């Protein structure tokens, strides 16, 4: 931790300005300068984690290799940095309060009255410092907007850290909005000025202003922001919209963001090696080929619910020089008459709950019968089993006990116990609490030889991430396999991890979530081969 330098990223004016992408972009540039870099996300909500939150409320829940259910921004961090992060890279107010209360119950505060300062702020600082061990730089993204009640004590902790570590160890980057008023054809800086004033009132002074704007800012406007916000002129970085989020590091580099960072930290001029990154971004922006994927989901009103999967398709497309277009198909309305003209492949993602299930099953049946490349992920694989049992084996009562605990043929069921990542036995029932009771994180999968899975991964054993409670019931395996649906992946205790259908161009189901390990520089192999198959169809 002694050598670590900290870059705190806050947001002002309004939410959803792209602090996560901004943090990822800064980290990427520093990483390509051969520094050890990581990112920490602070979420100011009181939930322990987002695991039980609705996807429509929070967006995607991203699962780390060590089984933490985290904010979707952790997914961005991993994809930009091309490395695994852990539960240390995300914490919430709920976790902070729980730790402080637990310590108080243990008597660790020696009978003191527990207060926001110093006890809560000390716990925040402890976690930040812990995440910085062994690093040259830790970028810390503070969720929410400056002025929110929920974020006050985080800003106080940042103020204290700067005092403890010294100016040469801390930079504050403030992401703000420069709105464009169409009627007067003007860009307005006043919201940024007021946001910085509020931030300074709380004891935190930014050294870099990252101005989100729909249009470039001229020198006069940049100088105005610099003067009113008390920063150097070259410390006003304009972040206009880009055609791809992966172009943001290049934009920031062109804007000169590394100059004030190097100056503040007393570093030599920074020269990131971005040639390979630039090549992939060019293929995203100007691809040679196109392919259309039918994405059958139920959380379509908030597509960030499927963020990692959307990005994984982009990664695969970049490596195949193809633009992957998504045809969003609402599972609640999908039926045998749904128009699939121009759709090159069908993707059924993971999910929870009974809503939209029959539409997904119908989509799987059509992919099977119409020889469309198909990839089913988690629930998507489970429903592929249900569809096959109903329509090929004739087991009309086949279902998952998630939707009908008394179904005639429980081909997907809740197993009472399983071994977790630490080889500890876990017990779960239909009445178990929802939070933290799933099979979470990275587990090993043994791959059968001569399968599509082996062809994709090119090795006999892989590790992929999971997030589910229900498993495929092996009782009916012999019947499926006699009709051509083969089990090609096994986990611990012979849990079924992957299936493939014979005599089909590409029909694969996986219990794990391959999207969680896909990166721009290294797309997930099974998703890559899925897109390859779709391209051969287009």
UniProtKB/Swiss-Prot annotation:
ATP binds at residues 16-21, 73. Residues 1-267 are annotated as: Amidoligase domain. Mg(2+) binds at residues 73, 141. Residues 292-538 form the Glutamine amidotransferase type-1 domain. It is an enzyme of class 6 (ligase). The active site is at 378 (nucleophile), 513, 515. One of its GO terms (biological process) is 'de novo' CTP biosynthetic process. PROSITE patterns: GATASE_TYPE_1. GO terms for cellular component: cytosol. UTP binds at residues 15, 188-193, 224. Its EC number is 6.3.4.2. Pathway: Pyrimidine metabolism; CTP biosynthesis via de novo pathway; CTP from UDP: step 2/2. L-glutamine binds at residues 351, 379-382, 402, 469. It catalyses: UTP + L-glutamine + ATP + H2O = CTP + L-glutamate + ADP + phosphate + 2 H(+); L-glutamine + H2O = L-glutamate + NH4(+); UTP + NH4(+) + ATP = CTP + ADP + phosphate + 2 H(+). Homotetramer. Belongs to the CTP synthase family. PANTHER family: CTP SYNTHASE, CTP SYNTHASE-RELATED. This is CTP synthase.
């Amino acid at each position: 931790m002694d050598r670590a330098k900290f870059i705190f990223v806050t947001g002002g004016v309004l939410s959803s300005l792209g602090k996560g992408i901004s943090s990822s972009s800064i980290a990427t540039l520093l990483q390509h300068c051969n520094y050890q870099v990581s990112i920490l996300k602070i979420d100011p909500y009181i939930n322990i984690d987002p695991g039980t939150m609705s996807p429509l409320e929070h967006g995607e829940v991203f699962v780390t290799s060590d089984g933490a259910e985290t904010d979707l921004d952790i997914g961005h961090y991993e994809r930009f940095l091309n490395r695994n992060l852990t539960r240390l890279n995300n914490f919430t107010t709920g976790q902070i309060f729980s730790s402080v209360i637990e310590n108080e119950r243990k008597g660790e505060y020696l009978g003191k009255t527990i207060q926001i300062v110093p006890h809560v702020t000390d716990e925040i600082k402890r976690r930040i410092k812990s995440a910085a061990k062994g690093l040259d730089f830790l970028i810390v993204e503070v969720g929410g907007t400056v002025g929110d009640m929920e974020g006050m004590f985080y800003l106080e902790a940042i103020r204290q850290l700067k005092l403890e570590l010294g100016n040469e160890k801390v930079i504050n980057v403030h992401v703000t909005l420069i709105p464009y008023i169409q009627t007067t054809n003007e860009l307005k800086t006043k919201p940024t000025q007021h946001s910085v004033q509020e931030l300074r009132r709380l004891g935190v002074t930014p050294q870099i202003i990252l101005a989100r704007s729909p249009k470039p800012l001229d020198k006069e406007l940049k100088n105005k922001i610099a003067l009113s916000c008390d920063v150097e002129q070259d410390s006003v970085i304009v972040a206009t919209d880009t055609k791809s989020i992966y172009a943001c590091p290049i934009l920031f580099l062109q804007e000169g963001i590394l100059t004030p960072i190097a100056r503040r930290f007393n570093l030599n001029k920074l020269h990131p090696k971005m040639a390979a990154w630039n090549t992939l971004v060019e293929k995203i922006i100007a691809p040679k080929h196109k392919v259309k994927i039918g994405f059958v989901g139920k959380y379509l009103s908030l597509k960030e619910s499927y963020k990692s999967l959307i990005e994984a398709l982009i990664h695969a497309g970049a490596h195949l020089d193809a633009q992957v277009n998504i045809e969003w198909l609402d599972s609640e309305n999908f039926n045998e008459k749904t128009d699939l003209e121009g759709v090159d492949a069908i993707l059924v993602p993971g999910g929870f709950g009974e809503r939209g299930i029959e539409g997904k099953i119908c989509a799987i049946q059509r992919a099977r019968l119409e020889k469309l490349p198909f990839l089913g992920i988690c629930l998507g694989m489970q429903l592929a089993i249900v569809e096959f049992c109903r329509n090929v084996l004739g087991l009309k009562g086949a279902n998952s006990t998630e939707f009908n605990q008394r179904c005639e043929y429980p081909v997907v069921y809740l197993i009472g116990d399983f071994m977790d990542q630490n080889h500890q036995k876990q017990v779960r029932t239909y009445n178990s609490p929802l939070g933290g009771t799933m099979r979470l994180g990275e587990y090993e999968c043994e791959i059968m030889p001569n399968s599509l899975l082996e062809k994709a991964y090119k090795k006999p054993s892989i590790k992929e991430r999971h997030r589910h409670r229900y498993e495929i019931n092996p009782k009916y395996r012999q019947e499926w396999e006699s009709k051509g649906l083969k089990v090609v992946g096994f986990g611990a205790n012979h849990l079924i991890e992957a299936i493939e259908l014979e005599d089909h161009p590409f029909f694969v189901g996986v219990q794990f979530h391959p999207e969680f390990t896909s990166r721009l520089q290294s797309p997930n192999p099974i998703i890559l081969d899925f897109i390859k198959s779709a391209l051969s169809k287009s």
